Amino acid sequence: MDKKASRIRRATRARRKIAELGATRLVVHRTPRHVYAQVIASNGSEVIAAASTVEKAIREQVKNTGNVDAAKAVGKAIAERALEKGVETVAFDRSGFQYHGRVAALAESAREAGLKF
């Protein structure tokens, strides 16, 4: 099994467990160049809030879009947008990525901005 297939297997398993809880989830995806985050409703069919380093507002705040500082900016933005929509508690879905580096930075930044998970 290659690296991507292993990550997808881990992500599927985690999503199944989150679906059993019926919780709103904060989904993180990372590429070498960008970081993306979405808050998805418990039914799985509605995106409540989204933020990424592709957005002009976030891109202007950071020098490089693929590093820890960019992930912190995305974490803060997603937390603010989720709180505006009335979502305070989420389940963190790391999409099979290791809780380290950019993924951890995004999570810590979202927690500091007021999101609970």
From Swiss-Prot:
GO terms for molecular function: 5S rRNA binding; structural constituent of ribosome. GO terms for biological process: translation. InterPro entries: Ribosomal_uL18_bac-type, Ribosomal_uL18_bac/euk. It comes from the Bacteria. Keywords: Ribonucleoprotein, Ribosomal protein, RNA-binding, rRNA-binding. One of its GO terms (cellular component) is cytosolic large ribosomal subunit. This is one of the proteins that bind and probably mediate the attachment of the 5S RNA into the large ribosomal subunit, where it forms part of the central protuberance. Belongs to the universal ribosomal protein uL18 family. Part of the 50S ribosomal subunit; part of the 5S rRNA/L5/L18/L25 subcomplex. Contacts the 5S and 23S rRNAs. This is Large ribosomal subunit protein uL18.
